[in-house]
Each structure stands twice: as C-alpha cells, then as structure tokens.
C-alpha cells in the first residue's frame, strides 16, 4: 500500500507532545491496574442505578403518555405498607413495562422520590452485583426500588428468592420487570 504522512503544524507540536505524554501516563496507570478513588459525593454502584434528579429526568419523557389500566395496580402496590411482597411486571418486549415504571416514578411524592431508585440490568450483570447494589441502597435508606430487565441475569432463576426473602422482608418495595415470564418462579 501507499504510505501517507501527515505533518503537524509547528505551532501545535508542543500541545501534541503534552497530549501524548498524558496518554502515555494514563496507559501506564491502566496497565498497573491503578484504581482511582470515587469522590465521596458519588455513590459507587456496580450496575446502572439512578436516584434523585437522574431518576426524575429518566422518567420525564413519559409525562404526557396515557396511563394504562394496569397502572392503578402498580400505584396501589407502591402506596400500601410493604408486606414481604414483590411486584413483577412481565410481558413481551416493547409492550410498555418500563414506560409503566417511569410513569410510577413521575407520580412519586418528593419524599418517596428521595427514597426511590431504578436499576437497569444488562446481560453482563450478575445476581451478586444486583444484590450488592440493593444492599447499598438499603443501607442508604432507599425503600422503593425498580429493577428493570431482571430476567437478563443469567443466574436469576436460581437466586430469585433473594428479592423477596432478603429485601422485601426488610421493608423494601421491589418492582421487577422482565420479558421472560417463565423466568419468574417465586
């Protein structure tokens, strides 16, 4: 193949050298496995967890959507005292489960929102990670947690009882959503 060369203008050489030195230093930190400390104001969750303003912003786009009949049952679950129960929303993909959850988040009072969280599960997450994040949320006083796409957890079926046996019995309201209705065994 042909050889192509690009020349850096003289007035940009020093800036480019500084950038290359920074990149080299950062690469060395990565190779050494250098872990940076998380600033104290940042909550260190292992998975995707939304709380506070992020949670409200996440829910905002569905504010004008019409509520479905099932919304009343979800709202009733959220309004009653927790009693060792977990609410499960299951159905086909793209049928509105997450939209329903977002609508419920929008309707939370300021006090409820301050103690609510949304967890987005990915295929790379494990039940152990979700468990650790739920424990962190419980320690910080969160009482209502929505866990979306929970059936993406490869070990979900084996450990599903964790949600009701550990967290719901301690007063946490859990709303789980997922696509594989056969995965819900409790």
What are these regions (language model features)?
Residues 1-7, 61-66:
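Short, exposed beta-strand "edge-strand" segments with a Pro/Gly-rich flavor and a Y/T-containing core
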Residues 2-33:
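A positively charged, amphipathic N-terminal helix/segment that binds anionic biomolecules
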Residues 28-186:
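Phosphate-binding site recognition
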């Amino acid at each position: 193949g042909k050889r192509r060369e690009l020349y850096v203008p003289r007035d940009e050489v020093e800036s480019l050298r500084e950038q290359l030195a920074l990149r080299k230093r950062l690469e060395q930190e990565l190779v050494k496995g250098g872990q940076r400390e998380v600033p104290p104001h940042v909550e260190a969750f292992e998975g995707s967890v939304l709380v506070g303003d992020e949670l409200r912003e996440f829910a905002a786009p569905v504010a004008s959507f019409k509520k479905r009949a099932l919304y009343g049952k979800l709202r009733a679950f959220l309004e009653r005292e927790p009693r060792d129960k977990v609410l499960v929303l299951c159905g086909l993909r793209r049928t509105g489960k997450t939209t329903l959850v977002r609508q419920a988040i929008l309707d939370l009072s300021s006090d409820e929102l301050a103690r609510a969280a949304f967890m987005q599960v990915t295929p790379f997450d494990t039940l152990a990670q979700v468990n650790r994040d739920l424990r962190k949320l419980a320690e910080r006083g969160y009482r209502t947690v929505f866990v979306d796409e929970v059936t993406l957890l490869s070990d979900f079926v084996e450990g599903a009882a964790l949600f009701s046996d550990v967290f719901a019995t301690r007063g946490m309201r859990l709303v789980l959503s997922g696509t594989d209705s056969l995965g819900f065994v409790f």
